[in-house]
Regions:
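Catalytic or ion-translocation cores adjacent to nucleophile or general acid/base/metal-coordination motifs
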Residues: 235, 244-267, 273-327, 331-334
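Active-site microenvironments that recognize anionic phosphate/pyrophosphate groups
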Residues: 1-222, 226-229, 303-305, 319-323, ...
Length: 493
């Protein structure tokens, strides 16, 4: 296909999805010619393609051939983001449409903004489609298991280039507002096609965007316009509840503010939300509890592998007050019978992962108790995936996993496929498969070519549920339930 055909196809794509109008045609063609360092142009007589992945590949192959772009994943991503940036409207236009739609209906505004973020290729739909997703029916509810394949692995050239690249503090991190329209470099993603929505959260200037990796439907990131550290406190609870007041069709939660039990970015205050129902949301209250002075707030312990107190009521300020009381109690609480130590050597260990949503007209806040204490037996964390499950999951249990969605490493796609084949043929488990030997030795199945992979996928789901039990403070035993009640009693003292 001629390069002009790809240029024409991309301009038609922009028109068809509303990124541009017919009056923009000549300017868009000229922008693309400039990026491709092409001086001449005749409209193509070949049939156009509507497949964005195919269009961008054609343009990238041309750029590589002409020496405009290195032929590595990172370099190609930077260049095709520049291409899409040439078609992306300015922030004022995007913000204007969002605000106009929001006045009609918040859901209409986010529907439009999500589609826009996909159409600009900020969210690469064709990569997201490669992710593996399946369900596991646990005793706590139907959990989501995913193997993330859409986040590209860095190629060796990019790793070397990033190592040799001059260090810069702009943007300060991948969440800062300065990423909007940023060209990118070998050690920082390109965001030329990225547009952010300014919003108010509890009276503060915040921003709304989507995650480019979309772990679940309309996976959004809500972040402070200032580069300020994560902090779980009463203010955080008020902000979460403020967001679901403004966007009642979305849930929103925050990672904890301590290492091991927190997320990967602790330096910039942010939340994650979206339009998705997680297993934790549908998990019932197993035991109702009452907090003195807050009889207007319904409270209960949730039937979930992690230790969750659910607060529901009509007044978000009252919920935030009670959540703060529980948090302050938990920060200073120790119970050596279950391994909870509030402080060691002056370091705090206890915090909370909070999740807010609307329940009809009411507001709801789930408080997940966390503790990042380590021991000689569990050097990565007592309430962290234990070593016998590291073949499947050894990374931190963050907000998304807490709610019942496993984000598993991409290595597992090949490992589980190869493992299934080895179980059928009886081949020895060597190399990358050796780490799975103890796991599969405990399985009692008749493996066949037809069922082996399905069995392993379900067993992977079982491991994830057990990982959440590892991360839970109070185990689902009589002793664990009694210890949980002891903490509730402590809050009420």
């Amino acid at each position: 296909m001629k390069i002009e055909t790809y240029i024409d196809s991309l301009v038609s794509y922009a028109m068809n999805c509303g990124l541009a109008e017919p009056d923009d045609h000549v300017v868009l063609v000229n922008r693309l010619l400039d990026l491709l360092r092409k001086d001449d142009y005749e409209p193509s007589d070949e049939p156009q393609t509507e497949d964005l992945e195919e269009i961008l590949k054609g343009l990238l192959d041309y750029a590589v051939e002409k020496g405009l772009c290195d032929d590595g994943i990172t370099a190609r991503d930077i260049f095709d983001t520049r291409i899409m940036g040439a078609l992306t409207p300015m922030p004022r236009e995007v913000i204007g449409i969002f605000r106009y739609l929001y006045l009609e209906n918040p859901e209409a505004a986010t529907d439009w903004y999500y589609k826009f973020s996909c159409d600009t290729d900020y969210i690469r739909r064709y990569r997201i489609a490669k992710d593996m997703r399946w369900k596991y029916a646990s005793s706590y509810g139907e959990m989501d298991i995913t193997i993330n394949l859409s986040k590209p692995e860095k190629d060796p050239k990019a790793i070397a280039a990033a190592k040799n690249a001059p260090q810069t503090a702009y943007p300060k991190c991948q969440l800062c507002v300065e990423n909007e329209g940023y060209a990118g470099r070998m050690n920082h993603p390109a965001r030329a096609n990225h547009r952010i929505i300014p919003i108010q959260v509890a009276g503060e200037d915040w921003r709304l965007q989507y995650s480019p990796y979309v772990y679940y439907n309309e996976h959004c990131i809500v972040f402070n316009s200032r580069h300020t550290p994560m902090k779980i406190d009463k203010s955080a609870f008020r902000k979460l509840l403020s967001f679901v007041d403004a966007f009642p069709h979305y849930f929103v939660g925050s990672n904890a503010d301590l290492p091991i039990v927190g997320g990967s970015i602790l330096s910039h205050e942010h939340f994650q939300g979206g339009h998705y129902t997680f297993a934790m949301e549908t998990a019932p209250v197993e035991k109702e509890v009452s907090f003195q002075g807050f009889e207007d707030i319904r409270a209960g312990i949730v039937k979930w592998p992690m230790s969750v107190i659910r607060l529901t009521g009509a007044d978000p300020e009252r919920i935030a007050d009670l959540a703060d009381k529980i948090l302050l109690a938990w920060r200073g609480y120790s119970d050596e019978s279950v391994g909870v130590i509030a402080f060691s050597d002056g370091e705090p260990h206890n915090t909370i992962t909070p999740i807010a949503r609307r329940r009809g007209q009411d507001f709801e806040l789930d408080l997940v108790l966390r503790c990042n204490i380590t021991t000689a037996e569990h050097p990565m964390g007592v309430f962290h995936p234990h070593a016998d499950k590291h073949n499947i999951k050894k990374e931190n249990i963050g907000l998304i996993e807490v709610m019942g969605l496993a984000v598993l490493p991409s290595r597992l796609k090949k490992e589980l496929t190869d493992l299934a084949e080895a179980l059928v043929t009886g081949a020895p488990l060597t190399g990358d498969l050796e780490k799975h030997a103890a796991w599969v030795s405990g399985m009692n199945y008749e493996f066949t070519a037809e069922n082996a992979l399905d069995i392993l996928l379900q067993e992977t789901g079982k491991v994830f549920a057990a990982v959440l039990e590892d991360a839970g403070i109070y185990k689902n035993t009589e002793e664990g339930k009694a210890a949980f009640q002891a903490f509730v009693n402590y809050v009420n003292q």
